[in-house]
Regions:
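A short helix->beta-strand "capping" segment at the edge of beta-propeller domains
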Residues: 44-71, 261-263
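Blade-loop segments of beta-propeller domains
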Residues: 101-136
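Structural motif
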Residues: 91-96, 138-147, 192-199, 239-251, ...
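Loop/turn-rich, solvent-exposed surfaces of beta-rich toroidal or solenoidal domains
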Residues: 215-256
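Short coil/turn segments that connect the beta-strands within blades of beta-propeller domains
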Residues: 81-82, 126-127, 179-181, 227-228, ...
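Beta-propeller domains
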Residues: 42-53, 85-112
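Beta-strand-rich domains and repeat architectures in extracellular enzymes and scaffolds
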Residues: 63-90, 118
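Repeated scaffold domains used in trafficking and secretory/extracellular systems
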Residues: 71-78, 113-123, 165-176, 216-224, ...
Length: 326
């Protein structure tokens, strides 16, 4: 009897062992099909912690206000080959080295197939002006595109539509990054679209992806690429309360999906707090250029009246000497 029970138990054990090693029909089918279980979230891909690096967290430059120049455009500023280029909402202008206006295009949308009424911050590269163009009204934009102008004639040469796949809903600024053959764009809107920088091919204008800003500045107005970094102007100060706007920066790392954002400069030395706009770097003189407006009240990105004592909005470019280190 004991021998029979022992044989029975041994048989049950062997059956369980073999059953545990065998795959079920469903599992065999899944393995044969080559399906792999997807694991979310993905492993952390950020190398290093910016908050623990004094070199990364502190400003890259010290700034000293050198000059202030009144210009005719309220949106953007760019330096190229000794000349200064200024964008208004509906104009493009060129200034010589002495800040004298030498040429204006008052009809920059002529020849475009889509409706446009707004140019943001601009950049100039290889004899061409790059501009983000759109139709903008009361905080909402449509018909976003990249417009490329001849820097000599100020006439449009070609345009590229902004990718719907990108999710970008407004374009406030643009900059050329020759090191990676890229064109970068930013969004002013204070929502999901404003939390990214958008990358396009400098060659054919094709969309190359977007990069998450962590943490994103509020109301981004302009960007400029300089020496591996993108500098960002943010209209995050409330002018009615005398709060200053700011410049931020992030390192370009195409292997990452996100860019960590650091504070670079508080603009507490402008004539009067108002609305920061475009940004550029005079690479010849080692100076940062900041476009700034004062005198008008801004609601949803639109001029809605003037402050007391002003008969019109004043557009100025603040020129800062840049000194490496802290």
């Amino acid at each position: 009897m004991k021998k029979a029970i022992g044989l029975l138990l041994a048989g049950l054990f062997l059956s369980a062992l073999l059953g545990g090693c065998a795959s079920s029909p469903g599992e065999e089918k899944k393995e044969e099909a080559g399906d792999e279980p997807q694991v979310y979230p993905l492993p952390v891909n950020v190398m290093g912690r910016y908050e623990e690096s004094e070199q990364d967290m502190l400003p890259r430059f010290r700034y000293s206000l050198a000059e202030v120049h009144e210009v005719d455009g309220r949106q953007g500023i760019a330096w190229y080959d000794g000349m200064y280029y200024v964008s208004g909402s509906t104009t493009l202008s060129v200034y010589d080295a002495g800040w004298n206006c030498v040429k204006v295009n008052s009809s920059p949308f002529d020849g475009m197939e889509t409706t446009a009424n707004h140019i943001g911050d601009i950049d100039v590269w290889d004899g061409e002006i790059y501009a983000g163009v759109e139709y903008f009204m009361d905080g909402a934009a449509r018909d976003l595109q990249i417009a490329v102008y001849d820097a000599e004639t100020l006439q449009v040469k070609r345009t590229f539509p902004v990718s719907e796949e990108s999710g970008q809903t407004e374009v406030s600024g643009i900059t050329v990054d020759p090191d990676s053959s890229s064109v970068w764009m930013c969004c002013w809107e204070d929502g999901e679209s404003g939390r990214y920088l958008y990358r396009y091919s400098l060659g054919d204008g094709s969309y190359l992806g977007k990069y998450h800003l962590q943490a994103p500045p509020q109301w981004i107005q302009g960007i400029v690429y300089y020496d591996g970094w993108i500098y960002i102007t943010s209209d995050d100060g409330t002018a009615d309360l005398g709060e200053a706007d700011h410049i931020y920066r992030c390192r370009v790392d195409l292997e990452s999906t996100s860019f960590s954002v650091m504070l670079e400069r508080t603009l507490d030395d402008v004539t009067l707090q108002g609305e920061i706009e475009g940004i550029s770097v005079d690479r010849g003189a080692g100076r940062m250029l900041i476009s700034y407006n004062r005198g008008s009240r801004i609601v949803l990105g639109m001029v809605r009246g003037l402050y007391e004592g002003y008969e019109g909005e004043i557009h100025e470019v603040f020129v800062y000497d840049m000194y490496p280190g802290n």
